[in-house]
């Protein structure tokens, strides 16, 4: 994990601190383009590159718990224990969930986009097996035909995000891909108090594969949390295709 710190010129103790954790195949740079540039220059942003992504693309992704522990250590080394907003998209949401297990950190708001509620078991294991086969096949095709990979990414996430996402996918090792899929199929959900649950917003595109599972599990584990559905969108699609409005929405949570 490599943390990128973006601070306003006039940064004070009262400046809201925002943690933005990217999804699989994105990066800190992707979060800057999609979110930071649309949230204003008067906030303090902490934007990590997870292992196997961005400037850390040469490193093997091992686990969400390892990434969260590294983020936690980075925060404590700089005496940052209270954040205005914690944001995690897809894989980033799994890492954010792991981060919530550290009781020495607190957040005013927690925002999860397209995060997994698959927590192991027979169905999750079957899904993990299939997804590993599918993603490894797609990985081989992307390496063989990078241009086609960019085109497919563009169809899902728009022109701006397509090329870097394709490049990250091609650079990623098979083992990192398998480890990420394992984590997203076996999420260890943290125990949250009623107050912590009320700080949580879980959002999904209406076409998101993970939505059905979230609708089933969320009311049982986090009954006080908010579920929002983006009509007409797929997995993590709104944050890239409607980034100006999305960034403004996140900003309004903290200012």
Segments and roles (model prediction):
Residues 87-96:
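Gly/Ala-rich beta-loop-alpha elbow adjacent to hydrolase catalytic centers
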Residues 7-57:
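Conserved HGGG/HGGXW glycine-rich cap/lid loop of the alpha/beta-hydrolase fold
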Residues 46-85:
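Active-site loop/oxyanion-hole signature of alpha/beta-hydrolase fold enzymes
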Residues 195-196, 202-204:
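Short beta-strand/loop motif that positions the catalytic acidic residue
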Residues 101, 107-138:
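Flexible "cap/lid" loop of the alpha/beta hydrolase fold
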Residues 122-123, 140-194:
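Conserved alpha/beta-hydrolase catalytic His-Asp/Glu region
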Residues 209-215:
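Conserved alpha/beta-hydrolase "acid-adjacent" motif
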């Amino acid at each position: 994990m490599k943390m990128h710190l973006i601070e306003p010129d006039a940064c004070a103790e009262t400046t809201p601190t925002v943690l933005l954790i990217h999804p699989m195949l994105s990066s800190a740079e992707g979060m800057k383009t999609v979110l930071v540039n649309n949230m204003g220059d008067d906030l303090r942003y902490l934007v990590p590159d997870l292992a196997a992504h961005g400037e850390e693309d040469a490193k093997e992704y091992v686990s969400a718990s390892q990434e969260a522990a590294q983020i936690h250590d980075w925060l404590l080394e700089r005496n940052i224990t209270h954040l205005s907003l914690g944001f995690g998209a897809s894989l980033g949401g799994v890492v954010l969930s792991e981060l919530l297990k550290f009781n020495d950190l607190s957040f005013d708001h927690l925002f999860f986009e397209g995060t997994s509620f698959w927590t192991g078991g027979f169905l999750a294991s079957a899904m993990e097996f299939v997804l590993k086969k599918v993603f490894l096949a797609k990985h081989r095709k992307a390496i063989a035909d990078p241009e086609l990979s960019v085109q497919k990414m563009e169809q899902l996430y728009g022109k701006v995000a397509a090329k870097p996402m394709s490049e990250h996918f091609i650079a990623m090792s098979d083992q990192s891909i398998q480890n990420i899929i394992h984590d997203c199929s076996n999420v260890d959900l943290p125990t949250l108090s009623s107050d912590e649950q009320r700080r949580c917003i879980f959002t999904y595109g209406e076409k998101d594969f993970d939505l059905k599972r979230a609708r089933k599990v969320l009311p049982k584990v986090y009954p006080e949390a908010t579920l929002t559905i983006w009509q007409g969108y797929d997995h993590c699609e709104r944050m890239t295709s409607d980034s100006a409005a999305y960034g403004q929405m996140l900003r309004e949570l903290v200012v």
